[in-house]
Swiss-Prot record:
Major localization class: membrane
Membrane spanning residue stretches: none
Protein name per its UniProtKB record: Glycosylation-dependent cell adhesion molecule 1
Residues bearing PTM Phosphoserine: 54, 59, 71
Keyword Glycoprotein found: yes
Subcellular location(s) per record: Cell membrane
PTM annotation, UniProt: Extensively O-glycosylated.
GO terms, biological process: cell adhesion
Skewed-composition ranges (Polar residues): 74-106
GO CC term, one of those recorded: plasma membrane
Residues covered by region (Disordered): 25-112
Length: 146
């Protein structure tokens, strides 16, 4: 029982740390809009009304969907941080590179501190849950079933 409890809390900790709430330098994925794909490609091969179908017919019925897959080449990343014209042209001076390095280090430091704070709080919560479960289990071991 303790093993499953610890396993549950470990998975909770892993998922909560994976979803640390936003920073200013978030990355967003950009994909092709779904409006570019014709609706005819998503139309099932046959149409049957609800009244004329039974559960047997549904198991035999096959639907064919044609989908256009988006390749990884069409997916790009886009920073929400605005870029100057110099950065877009690839002409960066030493001072602008220093500023970008400093801002990246600052946001990494903030992210690290936030992650450590979340880990500490989560550790406290897990310890509380484990002690509560241990109390329940130890209290239940003294009871006798009729």
């Amino acid at each position: 029982m303790k093993f499953f409890t610890v396993l549950l809390f470990a998975s909770l900790a892993a998922t909560s740390l994976a979803a640390v709430p936003g920073s200013k330098d978030e990355l967003h994925l950009r994909t092709q809009p779904t409006d570019a794909i014709p609706a005819s490609q998503f139309t099932p091969s046959s149409h049957i009304s609800k009244e004329s179908t039974s559960s047997k017919d549904l198991s035999k019925e096959s639907f064919i969907f044609n989908e256009e897959l988006v390749s990884e080449d069409n997916v790009g990343t886009e920073s929400t941080k605005p870029q100057s014209q110099e950065a877009q042209d690839g002409l960066r001076s030493g001072s602008s590179q220093q500023e970008e390095t400093t801002s990246a280090a600052t946001s990494e430091g903030k992210l690290t501190m936030l992650s450590q704070a979340v880990q500490k709080e989560l550790g406290k919560v897990i310890e509380g849950f484990i002690s509560g479960v241990e109390d329940i289990i130890s209290g239940a071991s003294g009871t006798v079933r009729p």
